[in-house]
Amino acid sequence: MTDKLKVALIGCGQIGYGWDPSIAGSGSEAFSHFAAISQSESFELVGVADTDSEILEELKRHDFLECENDWRRMLGERDRWDLVVVATPDETHSDILNEISEFNPSCVFVEKPLCMDSLSGDRIIKSFENEGISLLVNYSRRFMREYRALGEVIREGRMGTPLCLTVHYTGGLLHNGFHFLDLAHWFFGLPEEARIFPGHQKRNKSKDCSATIRCTYKSGLQFNLIGVGHESPTHHQVEFIGSEGGFRILNNERIEWQKSVPMERFEGFRKLSTKKHQEIKTGLALPNAYRSIAEHLEKSIPFERNAKSCLALNHLIENGLTVLPQHS
């Protein structure tokens, strides 16, 4: 359809393409940007760019796609793009975003983190504001209905007073840990006090170490983000404890809802007991995100979260934390 919003995809790795190369009909789940755009009723994927020649050869089987190994050349083939998606490695985001404004897209959707440092992020946001380019960062849990419901339950006090949020994660702080810093930021705001404990780096000497962060809020809530390294099996566990209930989430697959009940044997004591389980439909996150972008572009509906809010996480780890030395 010629009236669809035109999209360019920069980066066709796992989240860009590899995790879901399908072009199924509208309404199904999608685990890559390629699949989510292809299924959308509002968007048309016109061009893709990647430096991997094998991936490009695979994508060339789709006659409707313009495939390039240079994203600049791809963007230069049209006078105007409605949406440009950046799904490249984290450390490349700043350079790409700094140049994208020259091509004047209406909107840019970039994978988290926005950038590796707040100074670069501030510069990018200012440039986009000056050019009138909308910017959205993909913190995927914000586009999952199950997490939105969790936030509402917490804010409405249905689990009592928030006491503790503990998260274990593998991988780097910026690439994986930021998901959960953002979750705490979304649910509780920024902490009053925080400390960071540097962890292990990747064998390729990446600066993105698997750090541990401990935060305290004015309310007394404790947030513990615990990095368990790069070499362990993929593991993300979230546990929340409130005075009247809680929940646990393992690997973003399902929520175990808990409630506070009296202990049968020990009078006067209470425990958290599993109330029900709820599946998390992770495959709907990207379709939901693209619906939000379409509403923004077609109906001028503002994004619920602006890019400056995302930079609060970078500022937190750069300026707001006391960095403690590692112990041997």
Task: For each feature predicted by the language model, list its residue ranges.
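N-terminal Rossmann-like dinucleotide-binding module
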Residues: 1-62, 294
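C-terminal helix-rich "cap/oligomerization" subdomain common to oxidoreductases
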Residues: 1-5, 49, 83-86, 122, ...
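Nucleotide donor/acceptor-binding cores
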Residues: 3-5, 106, 133, 163
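Beta-loop-alpha module in the N-terminal Rossmann-like domain of NAD(P)-dependent dehydrogenases
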Residues: 51-54, 58, 63-128
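A contiguous active-site-proximal alpha/beta segment in oxidoreductase catalytic domains
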Residues: 83, 114-173, 325
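Hydrophobic residues in well-ordered beta-strands that form the structural core
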Residues: 109-110, 135-137, 249
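Rossmann-like dinucleotide-binding domain that binds NAD(P)(H)
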Residues: 161-239, 308-311
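NAD(P)-dinucleotide binding in Rossmann-like oxidoreductases
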Residues: 203-204, 219-289, 303-306
